[in-house]
């Protein structure tokens, strides 16, 4: 894996770039304070913009490390979401994604577009061997995003994630670099 860090990514409709502490109000308003948008992520909804500012301060500090991959997702000068590598296993060259999109932007293909763009960056530029993601089985829409982005279902891991309701199951999806190359050749 090449430690290339968080570089800007452009798609047809979106810009993915590093977070700034100045993004706190938009992040809070558009996703971090929304109980539905944060229902299946590992962090609780933020009670105020100060909590968002504190989180972003830590994320921005993390950019000093080239193994940090964490993007703000922009549509027409508005922050609509976040995507990051939440775990890396260097033994097998694997990167696990996590993402959150503001509810107003659901069902427009933005999440799939974001995941595809970051997978391309990780597989082609950072040279990971595998990108994976997981979702709560109750979050069917997130599973569809992963499948639409080209990932395949790998299995269910029971009671492996802790949230405010207790232990939860996770459905795993993944894509190998060799599979990615095959998909690109078919396009």
Identify the meaning behind each predicted range:
Residues 57-72, 81:
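A short helix-loop-beta-strand connector motif used in the catalytic cores of GNAT acetyltransferases and
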Residues 36-58:
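Conserved GNAT-fold acetyl-CoA-binding loop/helix
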Residues 1-26, 30-35, 70-187:
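Acyl-donor (CoA/ACP) binding surface of acyl/acetyltransferases
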Residues 31, 41, 63-64:
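Hydrophobic residues in alpha-helical segments
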């Amino acid at each position: 894996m090449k430690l290339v860090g968080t570089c800007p990514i452009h798609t047809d409709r979106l810009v993915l770039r590093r977070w700034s502490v100045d993004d706190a109000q938009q992040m809070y308003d558009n996703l971090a304070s929304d109980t539905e948008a944060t229902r299946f992520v590992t962090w609780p909804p933020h009670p105020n913009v100060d909590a968002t500012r504190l989180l972003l301060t830590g994320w921005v500090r993390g950019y000093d490390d080239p193994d940090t991959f964490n993007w703000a997702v922009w549509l027409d000068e508005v922050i609509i979401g976040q995507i990051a590598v939440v775990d890396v296993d260097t033994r097998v060259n694997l990167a696990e994604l996590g993402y959150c999109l503001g509810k107003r932007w659901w069902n427009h293909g933005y999440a799939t577009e974001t995941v595809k763009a970051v997978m391309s960056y990780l597989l082609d530029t950072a040279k990971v061997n595998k990108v994976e993601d997981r979702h709560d089985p109750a979050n069917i829409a997130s599973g569809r995003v992963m499948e639409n982005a080209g990932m395949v279902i790998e299995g269910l891991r029971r009671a492996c994630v802790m949230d405010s309701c207790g232990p939860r199951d996770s459905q795993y999806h993944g894509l190998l670099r060799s599979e990615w190359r095959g998909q690109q050749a078919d396009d």
